[in-house]
């Protein structure tokens, strides 16, 4: 019975993004490291849903797929509009 008393820990990997912003930073860095244009590749993924736009390097493909594409777009729009709103107040 002693063999069933220990807890087995499942590890998803060292890089677990807490939010869309941190995930996008990690994906962006992986794309740059591979020599791709990060903006073009991320836009291609968001439009098509094809994970082939994102490399496997540093687990970037799995990281981006942890979020729904509409969640990513929502965060990008929120971030853009919050920056734009701040710019107008200046």
UniProtKB/Swiss-Prot annotation:
Pfam families per record: IreB
NCBIfam families per record: PRK05473.1
Entry's family note: Belongs to the UPF0297 family.
| Protein name from the UniProt record | UPF0297 protein OEOE_1166
